[in-house]
Structures are given as C-alpha cells and as structure tokens.
C-alpha cells in the first residue's frame, strides 16, 4: 500500500540550497517508489524581500548579508555546484552574477498551483536562474518558464 506524504516545501527560487533539497527529496521518493507518493506544494519564502528591481551583485550581497569573504563565497559555490551535480542539477555559477527580487515569481507559482503545473514551473524557474543565469524577476523570463509548463501564458497576469 502506498502512503501519500503531503509536503509543504517552503523555498525561494533564488536559494541554491532549496533546489538541492528538492532534488534530494525527489531522489528519496524515487527510491521509495510504490511505498511513498509525494503530494508536494511549494510555499513562498522571499530570501530578499527588500531587494530592488535592479537586483544586486551576488558577491556584494553575500558579503553584506552573511559576512562572507570572496574566498568563502567561492568555496561555497564549489560545494553547491558539486552537490547539485551529484543530484543531477547543473549550477552554472559563471552565468549568475546577480541576485534578484522574486516576488513576481512567487505570484506566478501561486497561480501555477491552481492550474496544476506548480512543480514544473518551480523546476523551470530554478533552471532559468541557476543553470541559464536568467533574471527571475524579469517578466519575459517568467513567461518563458510558464511556456515550459504548457498552459497559455494569457491565463496568467502579473499586473
């Protein structure tokens, strides 16, 4: 008999540890296939709700918020990339130089849950930011991620 686990996954699309946690959770569920099924719901958490629309240089941000030196930041990026690779997710650290406000991405994820496409959109947003180096606050990026999930983008409004 399969047990269904309802999981509220609180995360931000600009958090590398969130995609690492999600991939690890998915792998664990795959290992327990037939025994456990996930009923996964993403809940919003903005890491940087006060972030301006222009974003901020990621090195500056990490130094200001966490006191990280450039050497510490580099070592952390290497650890994140290695952990992501082990879980089948590609971090392209050289493509990602800024951190952005993710409020509109969370708004779109809320809409996507109502349409039944939230997991695919969440994955597309993580990939857009961490693999492709795209700005998750840019509405064109959000529409491209939405198109990945197949519904008509005319159904979602970000105004």
Question: Where does each model-flagged region fall?
Answer:
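Single conserved hydrophobic/aromatic residue that forms the stacking wall/gate
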Residues: 148-159
């Amino acid at each position: 008999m399969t047990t269904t686990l309802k999981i509220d996954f609180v995360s931000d699309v600009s958090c590398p540890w969130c995609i690492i946690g999600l991939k690890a959770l998915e792998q664990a569920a795959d290992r327990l296939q037939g025994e456990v099924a996930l009923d996964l719901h993403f809940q919003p958490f903005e890491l940087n709700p006060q972030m301006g629309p222009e974003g901020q240089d990621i090195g500056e941000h990490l130094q200001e918020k966490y006191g990280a030196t450039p050497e510490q930041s580099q070592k952390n990026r290497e650890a994140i990339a290695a952990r992501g690779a082990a879980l089948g997710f590609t971090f392209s650290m050289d493509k990602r130089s800024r951190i952005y406000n993710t409020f509109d991405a969370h708004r779109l994820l809320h809409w996507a849950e109502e349409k039944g496409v939230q997991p695919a959109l969440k994955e597309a947003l993580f990939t857009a930011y961490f693999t492709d180096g795209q700005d998750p606050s840019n509405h064109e990026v959000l529409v491209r991620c939405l198109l990945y999930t197949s519904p008509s983008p005319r159904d979602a409004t970000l105004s």
